[in-house]
């Protein structure tokens, strides 16, 4: 061993393993406006103190590793390390805690959701000292938000493009989701748009399969859009799914959609990945395309109460990465969504400033500094009887999407669309007249059905349909 190395070892470096809490648990730390703040639900292994578990999360998601290393001395750990600055027990849960962690902004690449998630929800989720770990919320500092483009256009620009104001937008997912030829698919699109819907939608797993290649689908759907626009005098759209196996192919599909003159494309942002999504969002802003986002695969990440990541974090990440619409549950249909929690992340998608509110699952006040908002999309097992509740819960700035609730109408696709449009217009008018949609909703729908045989038929078909299961979270 050289004399120089001996001197270094004697004054600073001590090999071995030490408790994380000695370095990464700092309860006296005062958070900075530039810190990214995280709230983790931590379930330690038996015998692991909560402070050690919280510190381990801070370490493993920032600068730490399992042992002391020489190169710690070559940088300033105090500047770059994550810090667990608070631990609180979860009410009603044994051996479960909320650990608050602050990350210095310099740990993250500007404008990269991919890099942010690689650190914060990376290897730490497989850490043996933890039985389970869930990221409940993030506070994104304004200085970091300003490095992102965000949604391609946002709510107001979309309304201006569509010339539609004062009501939720109506959509429909074309079913069956797989197996139709491009021409038959386009026919269903035309019938739904002609009947009164604003949008129709590719299902998330419609890409470019042998039974319907993407270019054929784009052509027939564009024809359906323009034909229905000419007949109704309204601007229409179909979410053309540009998701593909490579980013290059995805952009090629978006370019073709722009050349056809359609208003909107679609992306599966979790299966496609944040890098691909951000690239597509940039293309859409530069070329005047709206971007609809589907959250396929989200339940793999967010459904377990004790492990993974809450959807509100995925929603915040999407607003940074870019999207004009995103699916957000319904509260009332077949897909999970508890009302106050759902409205919490709906506000995080739409509003410019959201106050901390633990009753709605919001752990931090979030200032979006005028980043454009995202329209929440309610879809999954909804039909005309749900229209009053959906109108009340989601308000005007939303998309209400009825797949089976349109195409399952006994008289066909166009009458199904008519039924939904009449129900929506009736609910909006009743609300504007001061009526209570929550109490009078069924009566409002029945009154409207007297003047719309299409709505009356829909009411009869779905009068007994309910999806009643306990919520997971």
UniProtKB/Swiss-Prot annotation:
Residue positions, PTM N6-carboxylysine: 201
Sites where the protein binds Mg(2+): 201, 203-204
Record's catalysed reaction(s): 2 (2R)-3-phosphoglycerate + 2 H(+) = D-ribulose 1,5-bisphosphate + CO2 + H2O; D-ribulose 1,5-bisphosphate + O2 = 2-phosphoglycolate + (2R)-3-phosphoglycerate + 2 H(+)
Post-translational modification: The disulfide bond which can form in the large chain dimeric partners within the hexadecamer appears to be associated with oxidative stress and protein turnover.
EC identifiers of the protein: 4.1.1.39
Tree of life domain: Eukaryota
PANTHER family recorded: RIBULOSE BISPHOSPHATE CARBOXYLASE, RIBULOSE BISPHOSPHATE CARBOXYLASE LARGE CHAIN
Protein known as: Ribulose bisphosphate carboxylase large chain
Organism the protein comes from: Sesbania sesban
The gene coding this protein: rbcL
